[in-house]
Amino acid sequence: MRPEEWIQLRFGWLKRHIYSEKNEITTFMIRDARQVSEMNFELYEEEYRPLKKGDMYFTPDGTAFIKADYELPAHLEGKKYCFLLKTAAEMIVKVNGVYAGGIDPNRERLNLSDYADGRQLHFEIMGYNRSKPDDERNPESLSVRGCRQIFEGGYIAVVNEAVQSLVYDIEMLLDAALSEVFGEDFSAMVIRGLDAALNLIDFDNLCDDDVRAASKYIDENIFANKDYKGSGKVALVAHSHLDIAYYWRRIHAVQKNLRTVLIQLRLMDKYPDFKYAHTQAHTYETVEKYYPEIFEELKKRIAEGRFEPVGAMYVEPDCNIPACESLIRQCLYGQSYFREKFGLTVNNCWLPDVFGNSWILPQILQKSGVDYFVSNKMSTWNDTNRFPHNNFIWKGIDGSEVYACVPPTHFITWNMPSQVQENWDAYQDKNEGGQTLQMFGYGDGGSGATEEMVELMHRFEKLSVMPETEHTTGSDFLKKNFDGNEKLATWDGELYLEMHRGTFTTKSKLKAYNRKLEFMLRDAELLSTLRIKNGEKYPAEKLREIYKKLMINQFHDILPGSHITPVYRDAMADYEQMEKVLFEIIGSGSEYFNTLNFQRKSIAFIPDKNGNITRKGEKGFFTKPDISALSNGKIENKKGNGDWIKVNGETVETPFYSIEFAPDGSILSLRDKELCREWVKGDFNKLKMYHDTPGNYDAWDILPNYKDRPCEISLKKPLEFIGADAQCAEFSVTLATEKSKWQMIIRLFRDSRGIEIENIVDWNEKHKLVKAEYGCNVLSRELVCDTSAGIIRRETHRNTSWQQARFEVCHHKWCDMAEQGGGVALINEGKYGVSAEGSTMALSLLRATIRPDPTSDMGTHNFCYMIYPHAGDAVSAEINNIAFEYNVPLRRTDVQCTLPDFGRLWLQAVKLSENGKYIVVRLCEQNGERGVVNLPEKAAVLNMLEDEIGETDKIEYSPFEIITLGFRM
């Protein structure tokens, strides 16, 4: 047996003596339940039943209510004792009506003597039966596996403090010695010392004197040995990442959050120096709403500066797919909550687990009272390149700058010496960045720091071989290491994560619905604001609650699609309810209102039960509206025949194009009559399907070699001409695989250069990816993409590993590939993933992942996108405006607009301010231009939190700038 094995064996013997006394509680009773809402449960049994040691307990993905009564032995009254229960579930424990704390797989005991008076103890336990994320659990299909467990009993126990202290010492030293990060000589010294110390203990007749002798030996021979010098400075911030939905529903996160908060509060009771950072205003809101007594306790710790709200946002959203205004509202509603409840403006954005960060974020943060940005995955999860900085300055699309921290190791650690050293070793800004940040605490399902982590932290200073550590708050770490630091490097660009690229496409219905609701909310707020002049009351609370619900569903494991089936159903139910309320707010009328702040020039589909076109299951007609910006107008279905188009088999002539189709609907030639050029080079409008088996992170990832495994799509019904009216001509083709059917309706227009593709899909695949590919006859080395608040240009060559890693990127309403003189745009209604190489771009349409949701994306789909060849580049062709027209329908409502003309600035939002004093107007420069807009009256200049910071009657804007104005009521 090797020396370290002999040490570990005796260490196991020692841990058996942590409890000097254990008294079993034999009166446990249980009844099972299913959680149906945040605080409501469906009980499976009318009465409690006995729960004995050795019984199986908990139902799949279920809740259990457990109770017990116990009379404390007389000799323990007034002494320190604890409640001991080992479980794989997540438990919230009340004793004599007091919340004593939480028990879960990461901790098995609660100190009770400070929370329970007298000898009579009444236990009330609520437990949720969790499963590890890697067990491929689906609550509806797995009825047993990974869900039930054996009850190991509950005890009133007394901790032998001498043994426990020695256990912490050895735990820390073994980790340091066996990890190899501190060197062989140090490891050998520790192994010799531990062996000698444990030799002082008679394990057949263990006594406290032997334990104290072993501890003294370790102090004098290992901790006192300063021959081994460490280097570096590491800031330790206690934290727990809490997914508000993931492998559990949102309703379960209420108790996950409470358990986490309770655990950290109880650690603060025991350790006066302990501090903890907790994100997401929404999680504080749920404590306030459902557990007001704990919220009052929480507020006291916040006032002390020990329980620290971090992350200025309402939830930790995905930062790729939500549009600019959604991210602004995350800050507005998050900061508003922290200000109202705690008197704090949180100066940092804390998003450790998001899947990359849009280039538009720095400006949003800077104008929302946020100076610092913390994320993590780029430094720890990239699959190709090592992100070059950890502490740096992040420059946004408009030139705004925020301090940024991307710690070099994972945001979930258990605070071991080896993890601290690994963090320092991986830290890339040692000379410029000051301390490196290490978060410690269990996460994903909450839980946070443990007693062991705090005890180890207190011992770190004894190990001279370790970096210098400081337990601090998140905000103090950021202020200390960033403010005034002129040595920091600058990263100018998006924070692209070289992983999880599939989340741009997975659960495509969620993404399309989110897009639709974002624009519905914009229009509902705009129209409600305009109606104030007519004496109508602005529905502030209703709109705020809808926005909050939308923001919750933009959480980074909901909107990206990385969750179980019930989470998807909850989100879709929310979306349907939000849509219904927004329709009511938008209202109806005799005329159509153009909510865009520019004249509509593009083709539009008008729902009409008498129409002769069926689009996405709704009758209607296409027309080219002539309605000015923010104005009303009438629209008629102009009757006429299709004499504007000539069809000869698969050859088609329109006013704009000469087109040659293939039988499968792909375009062999697209000759532009106006520009006298061919647009096709290679496969164009070609559906391509690939095997999509990324491994462990099924819903998250797409592998770079997916093109190596194509799948056959057969032609079931070749292209046929359906017919034409005065404005639109339709063609249909049906494709199929062994399991799925795919109808493509191709629409050509008399008065539009756009070519619309409607897809009607019966999707029943597993591990497949479908893209629509467009090989364009343009010489371009970049793909221009919409970010929702400006444009980003991405290289389409593969010269470096950085470009090779970006084989799939996120865009918003459109992407464009152009050369001098013309290009081709792809405009979508809710598809975010796109790839581009050379002169070929491919829009990702559907995936078919099975983990964590085996039913992901299965069923019927109906979606549209548009090919738009154009003269000039994307800016001169006004592709952004065309994309807005494609995404924002005309609203049938009667209202008059009194807003001024804002020139070429996009009218992003119009709303009543949160305090009711202003009409808030948010404008965004989308094309990279400078300019001036003169206002007819003076307006307040606001930040994104709606604080007044100035006054102006003239807007001098710069590229990609977001401007917020307040017009007084």
Where are these regions (language model features)?
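Alpha-helical scaffold elements lining the catalytic groove of polysaccharide deacetylases
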Residues: 319-340, 408-428, 708
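Beta-strand-rich ligand-recognition modules
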Residues: 92-139
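Catalytic alpha-helical scaffold of carbohydrate-active enzymes acting on polysaccharides/glycoconjugates
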Residues: 218-236, 255-271, 286-345, 359-367, ...
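Extended carbohydrate-recognition surfaces in non-catalytic/accessory domains of CAZymes
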Residues: 1-76, 683, 690-721
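Catalytic grooves of carbohydrate-active enzymes
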Residues: 173-203, 241, 245-247, 399-589, ...
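C-terminal (or distal) subdomains of carbohydrate-active enzymes
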Residues: 361-366, 376-380, 388-391, 424-425, ...
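Histidine-centered catalytic/metal-binding microenvironments
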Residues: 1-39, 150-248, 518-629, 633, ...
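Aromatic-lined ligand-binding clefts that engage carbohydrates, nucleic acids, or primary amines
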Residues: 77-95, 123, 593-595
